[in-house]
Amino acid sequence: MSNTDRLRRTEVVPLGNPTLRQISTVLATVVLAIVLISFRPFQPEGPAAAQGGDIVNQIGFGSLALLALFSLLTLADRRVVAMMVSPWWLIVFGFLALSVMHAIDPPSAMRAALFTAIGVLAIVTVLVLPRDAESFTTVLLVAGLAAVLLSYAGLILFPATAVHSGAGVEPQHAGLWRGAFSHKNVAGPVMACLSFAGLYAFRRGRRWAGGTLLVLAMIFMANTGSKTTAGLVPLSIVLVALPGIFGMRFLTPVIFMTMMIGAALATLGIVFIEPLKDLAQQVAPDLTYTGRTALWDFLGEMIAKKPWFGYGYESFWSTPFIYFMEQPFDRDWDIRGSVHGHNGYLDIAVLMGLPALAACLVAFWIVPVRDYMRTPRLKENIYLSDFFMMILMFTSLNAFLESFFLRRVDPVWLFFLMGCLGMRMAARIRIPSAWSG
C-alpha cells in the first residue's frame, strides 16, 4: 500500500487524488484476478494442461508484466516498492538464476523463470498499488469472488473440465472439484487462501462480502477432496488468531516455527531419520502419505548425488532422465509419471541444491516470522499481518505434501509469496484504514 505515514509522500505524483486511488485499486484487482484465474481457465486434464508455453499465455502474461511495471512506475510510491526488496529474496533469486544457467535446456528454463519473475512482479503490484486497507480489501474481495464464482459457474457450464473425470491418469480423483484451476491440488489451496481473505475482510467490517467469500471458498475447498487442506485451514486460523485474542500475539511466531519443525519430522523425518523411521513402522506401519514416502526416499538419493547445485531449474521432473530411469517393481510410486516431488522443500534441493534450500528456509520462514514480531501495534497492521501469517502457515505446511515454490505463475506459489512480502510491508509502514483526503 503506497499511501503511508512513515514514509514521506512524493511530490511528483499526487497520491491522495481520489481518482488515482480508484485507478490503482482497479489495476490491482485486475492483476490479482488474472493471476488467480489465468488466461486459460477450464483446461482439460493431463500433461497438456500443465504446459505454460502456449501463445495465449506468452502474450497474456507478457502484457500483464507490462501493465504491472507501468503501474509501479506511475502510480506507486517508489520508496515503498524499494522497501519490498529483501536481501534474502535476492539471494533466493540469485540461486534461481544459477540453476537456470546449468539447466539441461537453458532457453526453456529461462522462459519458465521469466514466468516466475512475472508472477513476482504481479504480486508486488497487488501489494503496493492499493492506497489503504480499505482499497486492499476491495481488491481481495472482487478478485477472490470473481475466481470463486467463475469456478462455481464452471461446475454447471463446463462440468467436463471443472470436475475431475475418471478417464485421465488419476481416476481416483473422479468427481472432485477443480473449477477454473488445473488440478484439485491447486484449487483446494487457492480456495483456502481466499477463505483467509474473506475472514480478513469480515474482521475489517466488510461482513457480507467477506462472509460470502469465506463460506463459498470453504464449501468449494471441501469438495476438492483434500482432507489435508480441510484440516489445515481451521488450524491455521486458530493458531494465528487465538494468541491475539488472549493478548499473547508473541506466541504466534513460536507456534509457527514449532509447526514447521513438527511437520518436517512427521513427513521427511520418518524417511531420513532412522529412529523416527523405526518409530513410524511400529506405531503406523502403513503411513506413507499416499505413497509419497517412496518418492521422497528417491529424491533423497538424487539430492545426495548433486547436493550443491542440484540438477537445474526445470531439469529433473518430466525429463528423459526420469522417463528412462528404471522403476523398481516394489516402489509405491512410479516416479516416471510425476511432475513434481510432492514436497516443495525437497524439490528446491533437487533442482537448485542444498545451499539454495537453506537460503529459501530463511526467506520463507525466518524473515516473515521476524517481520510478524516487528509489526506495529496498530489495528490495520495487525489485521493485515494476521491475514498474511494465516496464508504463510497454511502454504508452508501444505508444501510438505505438495510442490509449488518458484513455480511460474502457480496461484498457490503467488499466495505464498504474497504472505512473505506482505508481512514485510505490514512490519515497516503504517497502514491507513481508508483514504482521508
Model regions: which residues?
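Hydrophobic transmembrane alpha-helices and their immediate junctions
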Residues: 128, 206-209, 242, 351-396, ...
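Transmembrane signal-anchor hairpin modules in multi-pass inner-membrane enzymes, especially those
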Residues: 1-98, 128-141, 204, 381, ...
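Long extracytoplasmic/lumenal interhelical loops at the membrane interface
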Residues: 281-297, 305, 309-352, 371, ...
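Alpha-helical transmembrane segments of multi-pass inner-membrane proteins
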Residues: 64-65, 96-97, 137-172, 179-245, ...
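A membrane-periplasm/extracellular boundary helix in multi-pass inner-membrane enzymes
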Residues: 23, 152-159, 223-224, 241-287, ...
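Transmembrane alpha-helices of multi-pass inner-membrane enzymes
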Residues: 388-437
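Membrane-interface helix-loop-helix junctions at transmembrane boundaries of multi-pass membrane enzymes
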Residues: 17-23, 72-87, 201-212, 248-257, ...
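Aromatic-anchored transmembrane helix interface
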Residues: 85-93, 106-128, 138-144, 148
